């Protein structure tokens, strides 16, 4: 089997498969850590952010503030590492960010707690979270550029969907490890040292991902752009900013709903609905399995019918179902099986947005600014609508007493995304040999007309 680069030159499919694996492993590690942090948020709050005299709710808010701060460094990482990726290549930047992510996550597993070093503990944790935010900002743009630029014609949706799929696997792995540790250890062991094991497991996985990325080739788009000079032809800044803003609007629903259902849910169920730690983790696992189940089919479907209709369906379903879902979870009369099915379905609906999302963002930018542009659009959306989700929801519930806040938050963000998708449609794949060299203005104009059709298989 052969695949074709942007210049229609046949190449072996081995580099494409290697790129898919190397990009996926890095994404898995990044999101495994976020899954672990979310799952152990109540434990981390007690160990790092809850000195004597501080209430549990206040400690949890501080934990989510640290979580949000890391997200606000993602756009910085996307800008810095994205510019490097557009100048020197995707490969060296992806090597650098996986090393940074692995080191920061492993160090969290050996940090002293508040009981040992006092107020220094939360500052050390926050510093490592900042390093993770910087590396995560560079990871997404590089990984998606890597996967979609190696994708065969007409398969960018499927290849890009692997980024989201490994996000789901990472979150599932984090929640699964947390659930396993909660099962085999008692509460005291888990709180004092058990949670550290989940972070320390990052080290061997990170070393494996680093080895894979050291063996990568540079992407065909970047190599060909370097030869032709296209990577030095940067579009006007105002056009890039307009495309980034459009991208943020399209993916904010995916960001908000994804984090509400997949990351914030465990602590919400424990702190607001008095669920046990094991029950909260089970709900997260079910939601994440549903999320993973629809991502690849949604990406593949978007190669056939377009990114817009698939993502729009997911956004509208979140708007319609968020409040009924939360009311069902609050109802003591509803069986556990029914609640589990609805939680699974909530994750599956988010997968409809996450599957086509990476390819949609990649198709909005030419090679010369792709790493930067798609990375910034995703990082800005996540910084505001994901990183702040836990903080906003927890603080709002605490202040208002309204336990439906998570549903309103996810539904409102998806409503805005639906409007952005309706106004500016995405085709079945809009960059091609010529489109990849076009500036962002041409991409956006074509997008508003409905986009191009997928490239035929050669």
Where are these regions (language model features)?
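Helix-to-loop junctions at the C-terminal end of transmembrane segments
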Residues: 78-89, 295-307
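C-terminal ends and interior cores of transmembrane alpha-helices
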Residues: 99-118, 316-333
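A late C-terminal transmembrane helix in Major Facilitator Superfamily
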Residues: 368-399
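Extracytoplasmic gate region of multi-pass secondary transporters
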Residues: 38, 241-290, 386-390
